[in-house]
From Swiss-Prot:
Effect on the protein upon substituting residue 171 to A: Activity reduced to 0.8% of wild-type
Source organism of the structure: Salvia splendens
Recorded consequence of changing residue 150 to A: Activity reduced to 67% of wild-type
GO MF annotation terms: anthocyanin 5-O-glucoside 6'''-O-malonyltransferase activity
Residues of the active site: 167 (proton acceptor), 390 (proton acceptor)
Protein name, entry field: Malonyl-coenzyme:anthocyanin 5-O-glucoside-6'''-O-malonyltransferase
Activity modulation notes: Completely inhibited by 10 mM p-coumaric acid, this inhibition is rapid, reversible and non-competitive. Completely inhibited by 0.1 mM Cu(2+), 0.1 mM Hg(2+) and 10 mM caffeic acid. Partially inhibited by 5 mM N-ethylmaleimide, 1 mM diethylpyrocarbonate and 1 mM acetyl-CoA.
Length: 462
């Protein structure tokens, strides 16, 4: 059957009329993402409904709750302002009349297949993302959309909420906070329940960039580099020439992996190291001395001095890079080596207040040094669980992070939707590369679990 997605409506949802204008300068945490591709995510919900119910009840309620959520998250409805005169500085701005572009659609694609964990063609998911708004011009500024939504009905089966955001808007904690607030307002408790649950000011977002201590003007250092890079309209990486698969690590798997590390390891370290070593073992091993890099992101809120509040909305991500020779990761004890390298970076830098921002002025040049090297990154975190965003339909059935389609290579990481304490790893790779990874993943998890390992069928991409 030919699958199609039909656009039923396009509209713009503003916050309530009383909203005040707001301008936010980009911190050095924000501005480094200026030319980064949009972050694209899909949330699938099992919520059978008819087209009539969808259009006349569900969609109007989602629009209303989105508008109310924007009351507390004004930047989401705004734009990124990029100066035509690069002596000025980019900023986020909400002005009266700004809004979130929303697309309403219907799909006859196979909902069960899309929400599965088996190998699926990556291109088909892009029908569920909102169109990319063009860059607009205003006086001395270029206006770039920073958030867009598409709500797609699968009649009688479920709903997909697809959204894309410019990374300058905020990191995972911030975006998950907004989506969760939208869901909470849309749910059973409504706006009154949301206000009651968030009566403490510390539970609502703050946008004050004065919390970011930048005495060395790192923001200006980054802008001096980034303003020389041509501004381009975002595009979808189609055709991707990739497939997507989800790999499950149950809690028992993670605990057994922890026992195989040389030093005590967290669940994140165990999962990340395992995937990293499997990627290397299943990839090109022609040069054993070549460096393999793993980028470890961490939320700096509460880790820096003075601390940045947890309800700070924006970017606050610090990254560290674990580096190991390819041959060592491809060896039999490659997982333990990977865990030691990742754990060492976390303990030595990311958990050390004196080290976490050391050399921050060199972040841009450090990024450029990684170009052309073999790198694995991470998108998402079980700590900021989008699957729990409940619009009144229960937790999401599946999260797909489409952003990783445009990277070589990155893994998505989230809590398991089916097994308490488990983790789901999402990958986007060429088909043959995915098959090679799957084979190594299966063999390695069985070896780590020992002879009492459960049925091999459970270690396939689920």
């Amino acid at each position: 059957m030919t699958t199609t997605t039909t656009i039923l409506e396009t509209c713009h949802i503003p916050p309530p009329p009383a909203a005040n204008d707001l301008s936010i300068p980009l911190s050095f945490f924000d501005i480094k993402w200026l030319h980064y591709h949009p972050v694209r995510r899909l949330l699938f919900y099992h919520h059978p409904s008819s087209k009539s119910q969808f259009l006349h009840t569900i969609v109007p309620h989602l629009k209303q709750s989105l508008s109310l959520a924007l009351t507390h998250y004004l930047p989401v409805a705004g734009n990124l302002l990029y100066p035509s005169n690069t002596e000025k500085f980019p900023q986020l701005r909400y002005a009266a009349g700004d809004s979130v572009p929303v697309t309403i659609a219907e799909s006859n694609s196979d909902f069960e297949s899309l929400t599965g964990n088996h190998t699926r063609d990556a291109d088909q998911f892009y029908d569920l993302l909102p169109p990319i708004p063009p860059i607009e011009e205003e006086s001395d500024w270029k206006l770039i959309n920073i958030f867009a939504v598409q709500i797609t009905l699968f009649p009688g089966e479920g709903i997909c909420i697809g959204f894309s955001n410019h990374h300058c808007l905020g990191d995972a904690r911030s975006i998950v906070g907004f989506i969760s607030a939208w869901g909470e307002i849309n749910g059973i408790g409504g706006y009154e329940g949301f206000l009651s649950n968030h009566s403490d000011s510390l539970s609502l977002p703050i946008f004050d960039r004065s919390f970011i201590n930048d005495p060395n003007k790192i923001d200006a250092i980054f802008w001096k580099v980034l303003r020389n890079i041509p501004l381009k309209t975002a595009s979808f990486p189609l055709p991707t020439n990739r497939v997507r698969s989800t790999f499950l690590l149950r809690r028992s798997d993670i605990e057994k992996l922890k026992t195989a590390t040389k030093s005590p390891a967290s669940s994140f370290v165990a999962a990340a190291a395992f995937v990293w070593s499997c990627m290397v073992k299943s990839g090109d091993k022609s040069d054993e001395n070549a460096p393999e890099l793993f980028i470890i992101p961490a939320d700096a809120r509460g880790r820096v001095d003075p601390p940045i509040p947890e309800n700070y909305f924006g970017n606050c991500i610090v990254s560290s890079v674990a580096q190991v020779e390819r041959g060592k990761l491809a060896a039999e004890d490659g997982f333990a080596v990977a865990a030691e390298a990742i754990g060492g970076e976390i303990e030595g830098k990311l958990k050390n207040r004196d080290e976490i921002l050391r050399g921050a002025e060199n972040w841009m040049s450090d990024i450029f040094k990684c170009f052309g090297m073999s790198v694995l990154g991470v998108s998402g975190s079980p700590k900021f669980d989008l699957l729990k965003a409940d619009f009144g339909w229960g937790k999401a059935r599946k999260l797909e992070v489409l952003s990783i389609d445009g990277e070589n290579h990155s893994m998505s990481l989230c809590s398991s939707s089916d097994f308490n304490g488990g983790l789901e790893v999402g990958l986007s790779l060429p088909r043959e590369r995915m098959a090679a990874f799957e084979e190594v993943f299966r063999a390695s998890i069985m070896a780590a679990s020992g002879p009492a390992r459960r049925s091999p069928a459970l270690v396939e991409p689920l």
